[in-house]
């Protein structure tokens, strides 16, 4: 952490030396435990947001935009710094407006021109077409985060708006992606049809976000998390979340 902390939290001291939103949110968590360097967290969050008008996702990566939203409320939970949320909230609103302006007819996000739908590096093929279950889970959590932050700053209309959007999206997750035969969320849907692929990403996030009932969480543990036939996670970055789900 010492090596990757400058004015901001950077990734890859020997390689990228760049600020990536997905890596930063994990750096923040390690920092809260090790140093509690709040100023570096705030500077990095501001940097990753950038200026208005919004013209692209954070680092151009769809999932990294969602991690950015989550990182703001994480910071509040650890610091109690409501003033920071007040300062940042207008930028959160315009960032979410950008995301909402790119949803499809189902209210879900898909990769569009200029978007990098990343998810993770993998040793196998990861289809990025259509509605990815992983992206919808992160999107839903981001909307819930917006509602929480709206409440913190006293924006009651915004709170109701984001709660309604989050509830509507959450209600679509299981009907759209859950496959009873596979006992898991499928990786994606293309043109309204579930793919045959099952990956770990949406399944493990839905577990630690508590989006599924206890029976389905246990089903995911057996059919996905402890199943060696499911594409394995190879990066420490995503392994972090897999271990969180197992915990």
Positions of the model-derived regions?
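Mature extracytoplasmic enzyme cores
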Residues: 1-9
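Glycine/proline-enriched, intrinsically flexible loops and inter-domain linkers
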Residues: 13-15
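Active-site core of glycosidic bond-cleaving carbohydrate-active enzymes
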Residues: 20-247
């Amino acid at each position: 952490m010492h090596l990757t902390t400058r004015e901001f939290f950077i990734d890859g001291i020997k390689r990228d030396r760049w600020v990536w939103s997905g890596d930063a949110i994990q750096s923040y968590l390690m920092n809260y435990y090790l140093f509690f360097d709040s100023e570096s967290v705030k500077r990095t969050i501001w940097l990753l947001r950038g200026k208005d008008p919004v013209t692209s996702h954070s680092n151009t990566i769809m999932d990294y935009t969602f991690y950015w939203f989550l990182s703001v409320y994480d910071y509040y939970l650890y610091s109690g710094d409501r003033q920071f949320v007040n300062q940042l909230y207008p930028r959160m609103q315009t960032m979410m407006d950008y995301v909402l302006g790119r949803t499809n007819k189902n209210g879900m996000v898909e990769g569009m021109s200029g978007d990098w739908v990343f998810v993770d590096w993998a040793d196998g093929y990861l289809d990025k077409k259509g509605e990815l279950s992983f992206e919808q889970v992160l999107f839903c959590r981001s909307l819930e985060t917006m509602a929480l932050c709206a409440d913190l700053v006293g924006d009651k209309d915004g709170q109701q708006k984001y709660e309604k959007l989050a509830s509507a999206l959450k209600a679509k997750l299981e009907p759209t992606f859950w496959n009873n035969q596979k006992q898991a969320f499928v990786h994606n849907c293309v043109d309204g049809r579930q793919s045959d692929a099952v990956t770990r990403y949406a399944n493990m996030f839905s577990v630690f976000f508590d989006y599924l009932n206890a029976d389905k969480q246990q089903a995911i543990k057996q059919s996905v998390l402890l199943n060696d036939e499911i594409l394995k996670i190879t990066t420490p970055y995503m392994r972090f979340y897999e271990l969180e789900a197992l915990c």
